[in-house]
Amino acid sequence: MATRRPVTFVKTMLTGNATDSPKRTRDYFFSPATPAEVVNDCHHRLQPESTQALKDMMSPLHPERVTTPVAVLGAEHDWLVAPPKELAATARAYHTTAQTLPAGHDMMLDTAWQRAATAIETAITGHHAHR
């Protein structure tokens, strides 16, 4: 978000609030295919994010300290977290591959939620099968 929408990034970091309309909620969290009623319902439930939590998310990661398998899932319509190049770099850092789903940032609330759930289930059951 910082490089693609710097003003929104600064506003969010200062206030914890990035969405002031259902349109922004759709743009930030959902794919274009998500029904308006889902977007509107989620918009009305949103509350400001903790500014401390936002700062914590900016801390560097240490993949070399991670000893458990990691599933890296990204969303095709997610511009909040990681563009495809960064998603692939994250997967490489954790010695795995990234899977991109046809969804927005809130992939479990989007139209492709079943694909997201299946990807998570596959990662978990695959991990347990190799124990």
Predicted segments — roles?
Residues 63-67, 91-94:
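Short, conserved loop/helix-junction motifs that constitute active-site signature segments
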Residues 58, 82-91:
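Short alpha-helix in the alpha/beta-hydrolase fold that links the catalytic acid
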Residues 1-14, 53-60:
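Flexible "cap/lid" loop of the alpha/beta hydrolase fold
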